[in-house]
Design a protein with these regions (language model features):
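A well-structured
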Residues: 1-154
Length: 154
């Protein structure tokens, strides 16, 4: 095996069919930036549900909003990381990756109350709501896993 075979090629030297098609995630960086700004506006709204999760309809709305926002956050995160992985020396994409990484830590603070709040509800509250509200069905597994922790929480 020749020594040249072990030299890492630059991205522009790689054939197009052998590259990730990241533009299917976002057509360009400006679209990414627009969605990032939208995420910064939408994510804090998750805090509006704090103290209200004992109401089943509110819990359903929380899960729906959280799902929408978290999918957007994941898409933004993946795009930035894949762009950075294309060429780790590209400072523009390093900055994008660092930007979303830092924001994801902030994002986590908007939902940090959810599990403790659910666990603090009176026994049987969530179970009763799951029986009465079909809208909680998609979240049954998640809620049951949270409730399994209740005996271990002071």
């Amino acid at each position: 095996m020749a020594m040249d075979d072990k030299v890492l090629k630059k991205r522009e030297e790689i054939q197009e069919q052998d590259k990730w098609s990241i533009n299917e995630i976002y057509s360009n960086d400006e679209v990414w930036e627009k969605e990032y700004k939208e995420l910064q506006e939408e994510a804090p709204k998750l805090k509006e549900f704090e103290g209200k999760l004992g109401d089943g309809e509110t819990l359903i709305r929380y899960f729906e909003v959280n799902e929408k926002v978290s999918r957007k956050a994941e898409k933004i995160y993946v795009y930035a990381h894949l762009r950075c992985d294309e060429d780790t020396s590209n400072t523009k994409y390093q900055a994008m990756m660092n930007k979303i990484d830092a924001y994801m830590a902030e994002y986590a603070t908007y939902t940090a109350y959810v599990v403790p709040e659910i666990l603090s509800l009176p026994d049987g509250t969530i179970e009763k709501q799951m029986e009465e509200l079909k809208g909680l069905e998609p979240y049954k597994f998640l809620l049951e896993n949270i409730l399994k922790e209740k005996p271990h929480v002071l």
